[in-house]
């Protein structure tokens, strides 16, 4: 049976820490993440990936192991972190043999389903993890494969303070860089006023950026391959720019 990727349609108060857009760009706003990609070299000697498995008692049930892909938020360090000096995991059977010998009773996982990230030289096991879902955000503009979405505000980017009128908040500018133009591949993006670019966004396999617009701005998109695009954006708006990985160099 073929598996089908589906997008999530629901109201969000905040932008998730990890997520995908409908073109399968992966985004994370936090350094605590795992990018699960199944990779095997042409020779078959180099590989990495992720699996999940169910624990019963002190042991991981090998028949429950399944390969997984995607991006995961891992708020806590791994419960097991093993590094080998020599190549120890050459294939999935090697991984299964090693996991069969693990006794997790002294670690006390917080839930029975564990996430295992592995390579030839290492194994990490996580008991707390959250998989990034695919979201379809409102599209404000696009130019070729560059898309601009309106997104909800992220968490933990505001500083709270109090005055005579009660609690208030302001953007924590230490998390941002003030810019008025930037490039994404061969797209030049220009604003008529300065905006704030979030510093700690990670995007793969394409590129992108997260922006806060403090006041009304006019945005211009220029590219040698596409018609110029202009759009007006209202103040207090969060924008997500997303560009899929180019199929060929210079092609977007």
Swiss-Prot record:
It comes from the Viruses. This is Uncharacterized protein 252.
